[in-house]
């Protein structure tokens, strides 16, 4: 269990999720995902 802290409604740490492109011409689709905190809890 990692300790998480809130900042401006977002939670840290966050991890980068990368999805391979659907075509060879595309770039890797990378986006940040908030890893720890869940909305609506506590």
From Swiss-Prot:
InterPro entries: Myo_ane_neurotoxin_sf, Myotoxin
One Pfam match: Myotoxins
GO cellular component: extracellular region
Keywords associated with the record: Antimicrobial, Disulfide bond, Ion channel impairing toxin, Myotoxin, Neurotoxin, Potassium channel impairing toxin, Secreted, Toxin, Voltage-gated potassium channel impairing toxin
Any one GO molecular function term: toxin activity
Listed PROSITE patterns: MYOTOXINS_1 (PS00459), MYOTOXINS_2 (PS51345)
SUPFAM superfamilies for this protein: Defensin-like
Subcellular location: Secreted
UniProt effect for mutating residue 19 to T: In fraction 5 and in 10% of fraction 2
S-S pairs: 4-36, 11-30, 18-37
Tissue localization of expression: Expressed by the venom gland.
GO biological process, one term: envenomation resulting in occlusion of the pore of voltage-gated potassium channel in another organism
Main localization category: secreted
Subunit structure: Monomer.
Function: Cationic peptide that possesses multiple functions. It acts as a cell-penetrating peptide (CPP), and as a potent voltage-gated potassium channel (Kv) inhibitor. It exhibits antimicrobial activities, hind limb paralysis, and severe muscle necrosis by a non-enzymatic mechanism. It also binds to sarcoplasmic reticulum calcium-ATPase.
Similarity comment text for this entry: Belongs to the crotamine-myotoxin family.
Name of the protein this chain belongs to: Myotoxin-A
Species whose genome carries this gene: Crotalus viridis viridis
């Amino acid at each position: 269990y990692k300790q998480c802290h809130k900042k401006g409604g977002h939670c840290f740490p966050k991890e980068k999720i990368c999805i391979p492109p659907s075509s060879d011409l595309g770039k890797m689709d990378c986006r940040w995902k908030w890893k720890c905190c869940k909305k609506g809890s506590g």
